[in-house]
Curated annotation (Swiss-Prot):
<feature type="propeptide">
    <location>
        <begin position="23"/>
        <end position="26"/>
    </location>
</feature>
<protein>
    <recommendedName>
        <fullName>U7-lycotoxin-Ls1c</fullName>
    </recommendedName>
</protein>
<dbReference type="Pfam" id="PF10530">
    <property type="entry name" value="Toxin_35"/>
</dbReference>
<dbReference type="GO" id="GO:0090729">
    <property type="term" value="F:toxin activity"/>
</dbReference>
<dbReference type="GO" id="GO:0005576">
    <property type="term" value="C:extracellular region"/>
</dbReference>
<keyword id="KW-0800">Toxin</keyword>
<keyword id="KW-1015">Disulfide bond</keyword>
<feature type="signal peptide">
    <location>
        <begin position="1"/>
        <end position="22"/>
    </location>
</feature>
<keyword id="KW-0964">Secreted</keyword>
<dbReference type="InterPro" id="IPR019553">
    <property type="entry name" value="Spider_toxin_CSTX_knottin"/>
</dbReference>
<keyword id="KW-0732">Signal</keyword>
<comment type="similarity">
    <text>Belongs to the neurotoxin 19 (CSTX) family. 07 (U7-Lctx) subfamily.</text>
</comment>
C-alpha cells in the first residue's frame, strides 16, 4: 500500500515539474519584442538592448527590445 502511494506521489511530482518547465519556456519575450531595462525576460540567446531616441536633436526617451546577444544596430 505504501509503495502505491509513494509511486503516485512521485508521478504527480514529475508531472508538475514538467508542466512548470513548459510554462516557463513559453513565458520568454521573443526576438524583436519590446522589453524592460532590467534585462530579464528575453528568450535564450537574446538580450534586452536599449537605445536612446532623438527627434531633431532632442532626446525623446529610450526604447528597449530583445535582440541577439552582441548585435549592434546603427543608422547609416
Amino acid at each position: 500500500m505504501k509503495l502505491i502511494i509513494f509511486t503516485g506521489l512521485a508521478l504527480l511530482l514529475i508531472v508538475s515539474l514538467i508542466d512548470v518547465e513548459a510554462q516557463n519556456e513559453g513565458a520568454c519575450i521573443p526576438h524583436g519584442s519590446v522589453c524592460t531595462t532590467n534585462h530579464a525576460g528575453c528568450c535564450s540567446k537574446l538580450s534586452c538592448d536599449c537605445y536612446r531616441r532623438f527627434e531633431k536633436g532632442v532626446e525623446k526617451g529610450q526604447k528597449c527590445w530583445c535582440i541577439e546577444t552582441g548585435v549592434t544596430f546603427s543608422k547609416e
